[in-house]
Amino acid sequence: VSRLDGYGRLDRSRTLTFTFDGATFTGHPGDTLASALLASGVHAVATSVTLGRPRGIAAAWSEDPSGLVQVEEPFPEPMLLASTIELTDGLVARGLPGRGRLAEVPDTARYDRRYTHCGLLVVGAGPAGLLAARTAARRGERVVLVDDRPAAGGTLLGTERIAGRSALDFVADTVVELRSYPDVLHLQRTTAFGHYDDGFVLALQRRTDHLGTDAPRNVSRQRVHRIRAAQVVVATGAHERPIVFEDNDR
């Protein structure tokens, strides 16, 4: 296994076992499927649709353009990015030859929705999003903060210091402060996927996917939040895009 000792937000005291393309590998809580595969020396995870060229992991989260996989267990789901799948014990997945396959068995999981009204909705819990949410909360506003990653922080999770102090301490202290306000709703693993007229935003929260087979049956797997906000701050950051040229995938 290829890993750097002392780096990464992993629980190295626990080992998770998963299967990819029929082979068994191990990882740790805090891994994504992509990071666990890379640590195990697996670089090609899929193939292109037309020419069958190998596709690997090109980015660390949803900006990855090519690491598409098919999850078979705990429930079949196609066309997911390996970089966004949190590793769970017993996960079974395989690389995609361009197209996925829908589940052939009934989905027995629960799904629900919730309606929320707020003065300020902040999309993205990186440095700008955390500060925007904290500033509004200190003014007494009703705030909703959503972020699609497992933990808040964004680029701060890979930054040593901010404003003369530890970046991780800043994130932790800000999250604790936001949690102390009764009118602040902070949702991680929640993707805002639609922004419509009059401050209406739809967001999908993944509530139990990261728990794998340990997910409680009395909790919905996913929840759609229908949010009506007086103001919306989009603090999702930016990502570099690879240059397009002939054979740039070789």
What is each residue range found by the language model?
Residues 1-20, 26-29, 40-70:
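Ubiquitin-like/PB1-type beta-grasp interaction modules and other compact soluble beta-rich domains
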Residues 13, 113-115, 138:
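Short, flexible coil/linker segments at domain boundaries that flank nucleotide/cofactor-interacting
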Residues 27, 46-47, 145-147, 187-188, ...:
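General beta-strand structural signal in soluble alpha/beta enzymes
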Residues 30, 124-126, 237:
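A short acidic Gly-Thr/Ser loop motif
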Residues 32-35:
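Short, structural beta-strand-to-alpha-helix junction motif
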Residues 43, 142, 183-185:
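Conserved beta-strand segments of alpha/beta enzyme cores
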Residues 50-60, 65, 71-73, 79-121, ...:
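FAD-binding core/adjacent interface of flavoenzyme oxidoreductases
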Residues 118-180, 241-246:
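Beta1-alpha1 glycine-rich phosphate/pyrophosphate-binding loop at the start
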